[in-house]
């Protein structure tokens, strides 16, 4: 029988702290007992993840899901999904969700006093190509207030969910935008101790993929597990 190779563990200080005093909700939901490391079995290392037939060719374009154009700055977000050894991850499911240009989510729990956009649902999905590339067309999300502390605002961000080759490469994370002054004030972003690891969550302006008179582009590469792993969301 061939040897079962497990995944490398994350580097210390590169993932968000389970209990971060400045991020209030972690106090109630973080583990209260020491974590137990369990061996990786065949089902976790090679297990199936999703059905590719669920993804439509146009699901990557969040600006074409309704009859009209959504309000806001149109942007392109693209990048590559890589494994812990730097190899492309083909046929990986990439899903995104976000607030609209006014900083409002369409779900009922969002009570932010900002307008909804009937032409923007704020969610999309795609599958990486043979070289691990993905691409979304969307609207730049707005910042919004949250009640973590006095005058708290979340920086503009896009949520990402990825399914790699197996269950252990599952990742939920957030992408931020370069130059945002709210980043250093945001407890979620700052809960990652290592500064270099935090910067992995910040996209880069991408002139090469910017479409003249149509949309600015941002690049966001994602690494599933390993020493250079993209930090997860907690």
Description of each model-found segment:
Residues 1-234:
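Beta-strand-dominated extracellular/periplasmic modules and repeats
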């Amino acid at each position: 029988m061939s040897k079962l190779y497990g995944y490398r563990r994350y580097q210390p200080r590169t993932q968000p702290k389970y209990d971060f005093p400045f991020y209030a909700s972690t106090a109630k939901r973080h583990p209260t007992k020491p974590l137990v490391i369990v061996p990786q079995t065949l089902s976790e290392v090679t297990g199936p993840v999703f059905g590719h037939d669920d993804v439509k060719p146009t699901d990557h374009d969040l600006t074409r899901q309704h009859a009209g154009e959504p309000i806001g700055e149109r942007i392109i977000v693209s990048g590559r999904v890589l494994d812990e050894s730097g190899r492309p991850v083909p046929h990986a499911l990439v899903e995104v969700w976000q607030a609209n240009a006014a900083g409002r989510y369409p779900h009922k729990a969002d009570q932010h006093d900002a307008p909804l956009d009937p032409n923007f649902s704020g969610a999309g999905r795609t599958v990486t190509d043979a070289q691990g590339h993905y691409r979304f067309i969307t609207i730049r999300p707005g910042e919004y207030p949250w009640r973590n502390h006095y005058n708290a605002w979340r920086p503009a961000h896009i949520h990402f969910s990825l399914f790699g080759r197996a269950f252990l490469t599952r990742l939920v994370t957030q992408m931020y935008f370069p130059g945002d002054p709210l980043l250093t004030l945001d407890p979620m972003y700052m809960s990652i101790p290592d500064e270099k690891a935090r910067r992995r969550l910040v996209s880069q302006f991408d002139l090469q993929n910017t479409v003249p008179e149509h949309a600015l582009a941002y690049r966001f590469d994602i690494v599933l597990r390993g020493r250079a792993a993209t930090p997860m969301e907690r």
